[in-house]
Amino acid sequence: MAKSTTFFISLTLPFLLLSVVTATYYQSMSPTVLGFQEEKFTHLHFYFHDVVTGPKPSMVIVAEPNGKAKNSLPFGTVVAMDDPLTVGPESDSKLVGKAQGIYTSISQEEMGLMMVMTMAFSDGEFNGSTLSILARNMIMSEPVREMAIVGGTGAFRFARGYAQAKFYSVDFTKGDAIVEYDIFVFHY
């Protein structure tokens, strides 16, 4: 009997100690403890200007594959961007922020991108706030592309939602594009 009790204690004691140690690094809490009130739902609408041409391009290719290319963004191309976000499609329209990040050409068969970008807002109610997108963007095969909003900062803390993107205008020869964005996001 003593041997089985000793065995049982030696088997359960590490689990008990582990559960005590594990429980010390987190706690469940209500969002109101951090000052978060009722969750909000926001719709944003703006235009994204991806400009290759001119004296001050907003995107640059930082890596590209060797060999012949079938299109302007062959598989494996990596692009860095600092694209203006504006109220209207015109380049001189009111600036509301920047889309900053990278995208990579991810498909050998069709024009597809992996977008890793932060939309940093610089005007109005959301000045200083950001939304982060991490998503596949099949720019040629889907007229309206849907991308995941995976987080945010400032007014968009705990953000989750999706972005819909569609070409407003695109010049495939030069590489310049204006993309219309509709963003639907839950946040506190």
Swiss-Prot record:
The keyword Lyase applies. GO terms for cellular component: apoplast. Its EC number is 4.2.1.139. It comes from the Eukaryota. Keywords: Apoplast, Glycoprotein, Lyase, Plant defense, Secreted, Signal. Glycans are attached at residue 127. Homodimer. Belongs to the plant dirigent protein family. PANTHER family: NUCLEOPORIN-RELATED. Involved in pterocarpan phytoalexin biosynthesis. Catalyzes the last step in the biosynthesis of the phytoalexin medicarpin, and thereby contributes to plant defense reactions. Dirigent proteins impart stereoselectivity on the phenoxy radical-coupling reaction, yielding optically active lignans from two molecules of coniferyl alcohol in the biosynthesis of lignans, flavonolignans, and alkaloids and thus plays a central role in plant secondary metabolism. This is Pterocarpan synthase 1. The lineage of its organism: Eukaryota, Viridiplantae, Streptophyta, Embryophyta, Tracheophyta. The gene is PTS1.
